[in-house]
Amino acid sequence: MKCVILAAGYAVRMYPLTCNYPKSLLVVDRKPILSHLVESVREFVSDITVVTNHKFHEVLSIWSRNYPEVSLVDDKTTCDAGRLGALVDLSLAIQPGSDYIVMASDNYLDFPLDSFIRYYQEVQTSCVMYHEIEDPDRLRRTAVISVSDSVVTSFTEKPECPCSTLAVPPFYIYTADDCAKLSDVISSGCNLDNLGSFAEWLHSRSTIHAFKMPGTCIDISDLYC
């Protein structure tokens, strides 16, 4: 298994805090959130790729000196208006023939990822994590799923009318066969900015299992804004 962490966004909603500093390096629990993510997964994967934009490539290069297992991919963008979108950024890092754990770089987990990875190893399909949220406003800002026998039966990114209280944060595991479908997703006309658009497209074409999170996921913007 390999890992991709997406850190190429510009976090304009958090300006001026993130105008000249990457959101992924904001500190939670005494260290950058990106450090938490790398440390939670590195013993389970053979390779970790962080996709960054060109504007923050240098500062992330400095950060990565403490993590020799991490390689950076520069998507060459320099501003929010020129961003490629999460799915295109993901395609820059995905290599054929490997399964991947894929994460956004702006969510903090208060539990280790080993249980999620072990679940994937048991079911041998692509997987998402979920937790329960009762607040309809929060549900409209995330991905929401329905589940039957632990299999995803519906998946909607940022639904106007949420079909359940099962919210999916941006942590996914994709099989090698499903990773090979990423180019089809990109050409399908889906919203390239939403990392969850891949799973949303995929769930009706491939089996995706849902893993109930054993802890909490916190969007870093909720801590700083």
State where each predicted segment sits.
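Conserved N-terminal catalytic core of the sugar/cofactor nucleotidyltransferase
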Residues: 2-5, 13, 27, 31-108, ...
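Active-site glycine-centered loops adjacent to acidic/histidine catalytic or metal-binding residues
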Residues: 9, 106, 132, 222
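Short alpha-helical oligomerization interface
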Residues: 19-23
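Anionic-ligand binding region
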Residues: 128-162
